[in-house]
From Swiss-Prot:
Residues 172-427 are annotated as: 2 X approximate repeats. Residues 46-87, 119-171, 539-562 are annotated as: Disordered. GO terms for cellular component: collagen-containing extracellular matrix; extracellular space. GO terms for molecular function: interleukin-2 receptor binding; protease binding. Pfam families: ECM1. Residues 1-19 form the signal peptide. Residues 543-552 have a biased composition (Gly residues). Involved in endochondral bone formation as negative regulator of bone mineralization. Stimulates the proliferation of endothelial cells and promotes angiogenesis. Inhibits MMP9 proteolytic activity. This is Extracellular matrix protein 1. The gene is Ecm1. It is found in: Secreted, Extracellular space, Extracellular matrix. Residues 129-154 have a biased composition (Basic and acidic residues). Glycans are attached at residues 376, 466, 538.
Length: 562
């Protein structure tokens, strides 16, 4: 019996060992074959799992411009869609789900658990072989991106709408100094070469241009834009002088010389720095001018100017009611321009308007008291609130329709209502900022009106007096030419006999007389000049009264004080 039992035990052990060895061979076969089998199926279907989210989303977003810091583009990269019918590849989809989540769709419960971690340890498939990394120039990258968008039109991201077709928008095509994305050239550079075809447009009085300087150009890393802006400023100054010629032949000859001189000086400035010059500057003579002519983006000068957002001088019988809420930002205008604020005449004799006029008159009296305390903002705000509360008391005492804001009780809600309806919240109703760098008929129309000049430069009121006294009596078409001549004569006088009577912080008088000197004055002294409308002949106490009737608020930095 003992021998039989021992024999049975030996046979049982041999059977178990044989069964274990067969199971091990199956497991090893699965371990070796399954990752390769899975990758083969995935490669055939077209999955690139798991994809790289940052690069994929970046390439799907519609960008019109590429950045040199973006990741390199890939050639022939496109999203491969899986077959729409699940019957085509049932085995592949099942194995793909098993690869992503081992707990889903377990086919063989007897499969050893150690096989699953080995599947997770397999590295993900890399970028398909068709994707070749390229590094083209920036311009070529833009062409690749644009052509790829046109051909494939990848699906947009969630919540992102496809780009709308581009339509003409003056705000997009106007000439302006922008801060943000800067390129290799300014809008309108190089300028078109003057010819009989564009001469009329060049000398059109309504044609506006941008005066370039530190206020609208970057000051670091873009010195080439400053040189382009200086060339455009010099060119426009010369154009203004040439367009005063009565003969078209003389005008054309003049603007041609101005254009050639501006381009020549631009190239001299380009070669004066250790950077790569403009491509046209590498040529000489007529070849250089022909190059600039071909490179001009707008040779016809047909440019839609940017809308000028400025406060126009008001006219008519409109009453500036309700008055704006006094704030620390507008209290200076409240006090300095108080004597310039005028009440419209010939107002309708209605009770409602008379009550508004009475409130404004009372408020101006209170403002005068507050301004004597050193531009006291708290005082002006309290006077504004008390005046409007009294106005509402009179409105509600009459059995008519009161002002809409008076329906609120005395509270911040009432104050907010009045402040929201104020037509001139900054108290600049009669203030207009003009640009004397280019004298136009519209500018002369403002200057010939009854106004006063507010400028930090002492000589500006004298210039405007010369322009108005000698030019406003001429016919309307001749006023602008006369004003430009008076401006140039005044500049010549300031840099000549009167050179020692004023300070020249911009050193304009050290430049050679002519276009360079006039351009310096246009850029530094004549760009922004404030005009005040109304009869201000009796205004005193707001500053220094000049011999021309102009007023200078505070000492002028460009004047020599005795």
């Amino acid at each position: 019996m003992g021998t039989i039992r021992s024999s049975a035990l030996i046979l049982a052990c041999l059977a178990l060992a044989s069964a274990a060895s067969e199971g091990a061979f199956k497991v090893s076969d699965q371990r070796e074959m399954k990752p390769e089998h899975l990758f083969q199926h995935l490669h055939e279907v077209g999955y690139a799992a798991p994809p790289s989210p940052p690069q994929t989303r970046r390439l799907q977003v519609h960008h019109s411009e590429t950045s040199p810091h973006d990741p390199p583009l890939f050639e022939e990269q496109k999203e491969v869609q899986p077959p729409s019918s699940p019957e085509d590849i049932p085995v592949y989809e099942e194995e793909w789900l098993t690869f992503l989540n081992p707990n889903v769709g377990k086919v063989d419960p007897a499969l050893p658990q150690e096989a699953i971690p080995l599947q997770k340890e397999q590295p993900p498939p890399r970028i398909p072989i068709e994707q070749k990394e390229i590094d083209p120039p920036v311009q070529h990258q833009e062409e690749i991106v644009q052509s790829r968008q046109k051909e494939e039109k990848p699906p947009t991201l969630t919540g992102q709408h496809p780009p709308e077709p581009r339509t003409w928008n003056p705000a997009r095509h106007c000439q302006q100094g922008r801060r943000g994305i800067w390129g290799h050239r300014l809008d309108g550079f190089p300028p078109g070469r003057p010819s009989p075809d564009n001469l009329k447009q060049i000398c059109l009085p309504e044609r506006q241009h941008v005066v370039y300087g530190p206020w609208n150009l970057p000051q670091t890393g873009y010195s080439h834009l400053s040189r382009q802006g200086e060339a455009l400023n010099l060119l426009e100054t010369g154009y203004s002088r040439c367009c005063r010629c009565r003969s078209d032949t003389n005008r054309l000859d003049c603007v041609k010389l101005v254009w050639e001189d501006a381009m020549t000086q631009f190239c001299e400035a380009e070669f004066s720095v250790k950077t790569r010059p403009h491509l046209c500057c590498k040529q000489r003579g007529e070849e250089r001018f022909s190059c600039f002519q071909k490179e001009a983006p707008r040779p016809d000068y047909l440019l839609r100017p940017c809308p000028i957002h400025q406060t126009g001088i008001s006219s008519g019988t409109q009453l500036p009611f309700p008055p704006g809420l006094p704030t620390p930002d507008n209290v200076k205008n409240i006090c300095l321009l108080r004597r310039f604020r005028s009440v419209p005449r010939n107002l309708p004799a209605t009770d409602a308007i008379q009550r508004q006029l009475q409130a404004l008159t009372r408020l101006e009296t209170e403002f005068q008291r507050c301004c004597r305390q050193g531009h006291n903002h708290t005082c002006t705000w309290k006077a504004w609130e008390d005046t409007l509360d009294g106005y509402c008391d009179r409105e509600l005492a009459i059995k008519t329709h009161p002002h809409s804001c008076c329906h609120y009780p005395p509270s911040p809600a009432r104050d907010e209502c009045f402040a929201h309806l104020a037509p001139y919240p900054n108290y600049d109703r009669d203030l207009l900022t003009v640009d004397l760098s280019r004298v136009t008929p519209n500018l002369m129309d403002h200057l010939c009106g009854n106004g006063r000049v507010l400028s930090k430069h002492k000589q500006i009121p004298g210039l405007i007096q010369n322009m108005t006294v000698r030019c406003c009596e001429l016919p309307y078409p001749e006023q602008a030419c006369c004003g430009e001549e008076e401006k140039l004569a005044f500049i010549e006088d300031l840099c000549g006999p009167r050179r020692n009577s004023w300070k020249d912080p911009a050193l304009c008088c050290t430049l050679s007389p002519g276009d360079k000197q006039a351009n310096c004055f246009n850029t530094n002294y004549l760009r922004n000049v404030a005009l005040v409308a109304g009869d201000t002949g009796n205004a005193t106490g707001l500053g220094q009264q000049g011999p021309t009737g102009g007023t200078n608020v505070g000492p002028a930095p460009g004047s020599k004080e005795e």
